[in-house]
Amino acid sequence: MTAPLDVTELRKQFSIGRPAIDGVSFAVPAGEIVVLLGPSGCGKTTTLRCVAGLEHPTSGEISIAGRVVSSPARGILVPPRSRDLGMVFQSYAVWPHMTVRQNVVYPLKHRKITRADAARMVDEVLELVGLSEYADRPVVALS
């Protein structure tokens, strides 16, 4: 069975000199939470930006749910919005005029899912991170 996220021999070269990523491979099994940990400048953010489709790898392959979304050698490059993937940036800013629930559901509005399914998914995520009781509060009320 394929992993929901499979990265093989990923390489990203921005310019002359050392590559930002050189031969990174990993798989994230279903239900797992994985941390990319390392010193500043080691390629963590570049790796995630390649997975999300915000950077184009120089070589290697990225598959999401068994579907190849990036393979320069095969001429495959699926755009970010078509990857069925979300990303929270390191400097993520919330929408201050929205509630916690509205901030969480916002990215789902671009997906082809019903409002009921989106509401269910948001409730599950808020429960998972212990924020259910704050769902309808203004997001700026969180510290």
Predicted regions and their residues:
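Conserved ABC ATPase "signature" region
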Residues: 67-71, 109-134
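Conserved ABC ATPase signature
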Residues: 138-142
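The feature captures the beta-strand-to-loop junction immediately N-terminal to the Walker
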Residues: 37-39
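Helix-to-loop junction immediately C-terminal to a conserved catalytic motif
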Residues: 52
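ABC ATPase NBD Q-loop/coupling interface
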Residues: 61-83, 113-114
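A short, flexible loop at the N-terminus of ABC-type nucleotide-binding domains that lies
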Residues: 1-7, 12-23, 30, 73-77, ...
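Pre-Walker A (P-loop) beta-loop-beta motif of ABC nucleotide-binding domains
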Residues: 24-35, 95
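Short coil-to-helix segment of the ABC ATPase nucleotide-binding domain corresponding to the Q-loop/switch region
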Residues: 98-107
